[in-house]
């Protein structure tokens, strides 16, 4: 669930729902819990767990995943588990960034693979059709593609925001990566935002973009 934006929004706008969020970060758990408490949200529970090990405490009418599958490899197994967590008429909504035609792994093969090494180690760039290929347990009902220029503008906004707050960001980088690597990581994060902005803007945003998928359980 990342830093909880979607979870908090759902819990706040649908107060009669019970929202379960999963993060592999204790820091994210603590932040989401603090924000929920400050807003008087009491229908949200946050679990700290690796998704590979997560055991759902119940079944759900809706499951939402935002940019998690890019960090996973075994789509078939995860789809099977999600199907088991869904109620019979439930739906799974999946948000991923993807390439137009070709899935590929992020593998650190040498000095030039800094993106794989520092930001997406073990991850994968899905292709737009990849969720359609694992249809044993979940079927894609609807599929939307969002032009990559939207994401490019988002990445530029993140870069501008970080640059404008350098004085407050540098101490965080120092605490996270150490004194000697503070400036190096500042530049790495700037390179990350710039490289990704260029990626999603390529070919008018039609090469890399965001995919949305609505899936339902396969009747067996």
Question: What is each residue range found by the language model?
Answer:
Residues 76-91:
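A short glycine-rich, Lys/Arg-flanked "PGG" loop and its adjoining helix->strand segment in the class I
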Residues 38-51:
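Conserved SAM-binding strand-loop segment of SAM-dependent methyltransferases
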Residues 62-74:
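A short SAM/SAH-binding and catalytic strip from SAM-dependent methyltransferases
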Residues 98-100, 104-210, 216-220:
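Substrate-binding/catalytic lobe of Class I Rossmann-like enzymes that use SAM or dcSAM, i.e.
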Residues 3-15:
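Conserved SAM-binding loop of SAM-dependent methyltransferases across substrates and taxa
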Residues 52-63:
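A short acidic, Gly/Pro-enriched loop at the edge of an enzyme's catalytic core
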Residues 32-33:
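Conserved SAM-binding loop
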Residues 18-23:
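Conserved SAM-binding motif I beta-strand of class I
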